[in-house]
């Protein structure tokens, strides 16, 4: 669905040159949900804007949805959906004073979809994205979650096989975020849509993505499933306290081949193991066999933030949402795709 090689984007600012994206290589297969995870300024949105034809690469190539990004950007635009970053609160403007159904039908018209088919698709999207009963309301009256679902619907009007979501849940409350995750999962389950999303939320990447690209300073630092990435960190951590035999327990556990690291602090033993769930019963049997009883035990696993910390030397910092009207930007892409006079 996506194959990019050496994507680079350089910006000139006064007397200096800034390389926002530096030689990104990536592949996305049909039907995947993949995530670009990284902090503000990592190059996530710049990469996404290149892949959606809104920003021309300084160098590099890409095939997107079967079309050449550089040679035939119009074909790319016709085959993708793009939902840019939300601004959180309505800022006013013509789209805010339109009805939800009008926004959907106008978007369909931008893609030159005939009226009857546009009405059918709009009704389908209203149902699929839980907008039932809202189609006759003004856009400005929608809640943040409702507006975000409308923006996704606008990106799906022309039934693209691939949709790009830029920070899809930024600014939403926890319940709305969870609800949005279900809708994103449904894009693949119900429509077979391939989803490429950017996010700075660790839990979002973990919960939604088949694969994650960790991005920092314009390069891909690592890629893999969330579990694969976590396994790159030192391992699961077992923390335990024993009843009056800490030194004996330490000596015994240090001999076990499954224990990669062991430390003791304040009578608490901290063990690093490869697979915590499998190692835990083994360790318990070893201690029990030696007559050592425990007073407390816990198991913790690495997080994607631990992965980011290991790869970059710092924790994933908070990202700031971008500006711009997301509804208007989605229409901009449709207009760019339909404005050349070419027909599908």
Predicted feature residues:
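Residues that cap or initiate secondary-structure elements
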Residues: 15, 32-34, 158, 246-248, ...
């Amino acid at each position: 669905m996506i194959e990019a090689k050496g994507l680079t984007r350089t910006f000139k600012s006064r007397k200096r040159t800034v390389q926002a994206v530096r030689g990104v290589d990536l592949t996305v297969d049909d039907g995947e949900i993949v995530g670009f995870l990284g902090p503000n300024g990592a190059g996530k949105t710049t990469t996404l804007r290149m892949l959606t034809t809104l920003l021309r690469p300084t160098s590099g190539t890409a095939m997107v949805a079967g079309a050449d990004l550089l040679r035939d950007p119009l074909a790319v635009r016709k085959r993708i959906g793009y939902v840019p970053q939300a601004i959180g609160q309505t800022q006013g403007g013509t789209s805010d004073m339109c009805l939800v159904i009008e926004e959907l039908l106008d978007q369909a018209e931008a893609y030159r979809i005939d009226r009857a088919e546009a009405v059918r698709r709009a009704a389908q999207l209203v149902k699929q994205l839980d907008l039932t009963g809202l189609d006759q309301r003004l856009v400005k009256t929608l809640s943040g979650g409702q507006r975000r679902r409308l923006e996704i619907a606008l990106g799906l009007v022309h039934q693209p096989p691939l949709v790009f979501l830029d920070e899809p849940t930024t600014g939403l409350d926890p319940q709305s975020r969870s609800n949005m995750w279900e809708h994103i999962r449904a894009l693949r389950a119900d429509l077979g849509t391939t989803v490429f999303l950017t996010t700075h939320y660790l839990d979002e990447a973990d919960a939604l993505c088949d694969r994650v690209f960790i991005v920092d300073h314009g390069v891909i630092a690592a890629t893999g499933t969330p579990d694969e990435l976590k396994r790159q960190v030192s391992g699961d951590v077992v923390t335990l306290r024993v009843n009056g035999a800490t030194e004996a327990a330490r000596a015994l556990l240090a001999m076990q081949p499954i224990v990669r690291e062991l430390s003791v602090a304040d009578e608490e033993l901290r063990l690093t193991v490869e697979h915590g769930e499998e190692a835990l019963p083994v360790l318990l049997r070893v201690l029990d066999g030696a007559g050592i009883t425990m007073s407390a035990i816990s198991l913790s696993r690495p997080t994607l933030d631990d992965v980011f910390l290991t790869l970059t030397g710092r924790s994933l910092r908070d990202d700031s949402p971008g500006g711009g009207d997301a509804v208007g930007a989605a229409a901009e892409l449709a207009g760019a795709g339909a404005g050349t006079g070419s027909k599908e």
